[in-house]
Regions:
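Short aromatic/hydrophobic "clamp" motif used to bind/position activated sugar donors
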Residues: 27
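Acidic donor-binding segment of Leloir-type glycosyltransferases
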Residues: 1-5
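Glycine-rich, basic loop-to-helix element that forms the pyrophosphate-binding segment
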Residues: 6-22
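Catalytic core of nucleotide-sugar-dependent glycosyltransferases
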Residues: 146-155, 160-187, 205, 209-236
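Amphipathic alpha-helical protein-interaction segments enriched in hydrophobic
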Residues: 189-208
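Donor-binding/catalytic cores of nucleotide-activated saccharide
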Residues: 11, 34-144, 152-164
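Active-site acidic Asp-centered loop
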Residues: 30-32
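Membrane-interface aromatic/basic loop that binds lipid-linked glycans or pyrophosphate carriers
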Residues: 34, 52-53, 212-282
Length: 282
């Protein structure tokens, strides 16, 4: 194992420098504050060798710490991932998308030729576009449920992020392109449906970031940003696709579907209160 530590302020420079210095047949890239549980790397290598997989996903633990330094984790289980052809890709990818593993590029093990192909194709690491391109090029994809990769959970309400919605739109566009490329094998439209639900989850996160983070944005600007997101063509497309299949999507689907900014704000605060008190919403 080569452990290569590179620091460079220029975007993408660390990744390319690290890859150029590496010698291994498998590549994993990660941040300094991310870590693997003991024996995880060897288990992932075993899976890669046993299955000839081009991509191996670990189980991901998204960790946050409270004021008492107690860890609270959301676990994305990779045990069920097994993709060997287009048919199994159409079956396996929707769960990969809905579970959130498709955005977890960090900590994933790639075969060296595949990783190099993604870099040479100009795909930016830590983007869904990088992952979807890799998935399309891969012959086999496996999950290693016994390997655990720890990463910091995203903090949606700490700081207002004005670029968040654009990022969600780009990620969904990459998933739409992936679904289009597999449309012949996906006669039931499962990938398209997963992409719509992915966009909905991202939109809800954007609304939470806008409404709950301390940002100093005026109520007028907040309403304008909210209306732009609710009236976006991609949002209306998602609402039409999920109107008969929105069970379990939570309090915000109704206000989003009716494009009511004030109701979205109210339901966002209500959902945050219910989450804090441990109440369940349908």
């Amino acid at each position: 194992i080569d452990l290569i530590d590179v620091e460079d302020a220029k975007r993408g420079a660390c990744l390319r420098a690290g890859f150029a210095a590496s010698r291994g047949s498998q590549i994993i890239a990660m941040n300094a504050d991310e870590w693997f549980a003991p024996q995880s790397l060897s288990k992932m290598v075993d899976i890669a060798c046993d299955t000839a997989a081009d991509i191996v996903f670990p189980t991901v633990s998204l960790d946050r710490y409270d004021a008492h330094r107690e860890r609270h984790s959301r676990v994305l289980d990779a045990a069920s991932i097994a993709i060997e052809d287009k048919s199994s890709m159409v079956t396996g990818l929707p769960q990969l998308i809905l579970d959130g593993l498709v955005v977890q590029t960090s900590g994933v093990m790639y075969g060296r030729p595949l990783f190099e192909a993604c870099l040479s194709h100009g795909k930016a690491y830590r983007t869904v576009e990088f992952m979807t391109y890799a998935l399309l090029q891969a012959q086999r994809v496996s999950g290693c449920g016994d390997a655990c990769f720890h990463a910091v959970a995203p903090k949606l309400t700490d700081v207002f992020d004005p670029t968040m919605y654009a990022r969600v739109s780009d990620e969904t566009r990459a998933l739409d392109e992936l679904a289009d490329s597999l449309s012949e094998a996906d006669s039931g439209g499962r990938l398209k449906l997963a992409s719509q639900k992915f966009y909905f989850a991202g939109l809800v996160a954007c609304i939470e970031n806008l409404c709950l983070s301390p940002h100093g944005v005026s109520s007028i600007e907040r309403s304008a940003r909210m209306r732009d997101m609710l009236e976006a063509p991609r949002t209306r497309q998602m609402v039409a696709a999920l109107k008969d299949n929105h069970r379990g999507l939570g309090l915000l689907f109704g206000p989003i579907a009716s494009a009511k900014p004030a109701r979205c704000v109210m339901c966002t605060h209500l959902a945050a209160f219910l989450n804090r008190t441990g109440a369940k919403t349908a």
